[in-house]
Amino acid sequence: MNRAAIAAGKPSGSISTGKPRRKTRAEVSEEMKHEIREAFDLFDADRSGRIDFHELKVAMRALGFDVKKEEIQRIMNEYDRDQLGEITFQDFEEVMIEKISNRDPTEEILKAFRLFDDDATGRISLKNLRRVAKELSENISDEELLAMIQEFDRDGDGEIDEEDFIAILRSTSAFS
C-alpha cells in the first residue's frame, strides 16, 4: 500500500472519484485491455515502460476520458511510488480498468448522442445521420436513413430525441 492510500484508509490502487464506488467488474474485455496497452505504448515515446503527467493526460483522453489536471495530479501522487514523476503500465492499466468499470452508462450514451446532434437541437435528424454516414464514408441512401429513424422514433416526429437514443442504446448489451 502506498502512503496516500493508507492515509485515506483505502486499498492501494483505488482512485477517489467523489462518487460511491461501484463494484469493479472482474473482467474488462480483451479488446479493451488491448486498447489500454495501445494508448500507453503510443504515448510512452521513449519506450521506458513509464509515462509522465502529460503523457498520462493524453493517453487517458485517447481512451475517452477528458480529465482535469487535478485528477491527473491525484493519480500521479497515488501511483508514482518512487517519485520520478512517472507511472508504469501496470499502474496505468489499473487506473483505466477502474475508470472504465465506473463509467456512468447514461453519460456515455449522452456523449454519443451529442456526436450525432452536432447542431445542438436535442434531436437527431435525417441531416445529422446523413453527415455521420458521410464522415464514416458509408454510402447510405436517405430512404435507409429514414428507415433507421422510423424504427427508433418512439413519438413519431421523424427525429430521434435523447430519450429515444437512450432507450436504443440501453437495449444493447454494451450499455445494459
From Swiss-Prot:
Primary localisation category: cytoplasm
GO biological process, one term: cell division
Organism: Giardia intestinalis
MF terms in GO: calcium ion binding
Similarity annotation: Belongs to the centrin family.
Segments crossing the lipid bilayer: none
The protein, known as: Caltractin
Keywords assigned by UniProt, alphabetized: Calcium, Cell cycle, Cell division, Cytoplasm, Cytoskeleton, Metal-binding, Mitosis, Repeat
Subunit structure: Monomer.
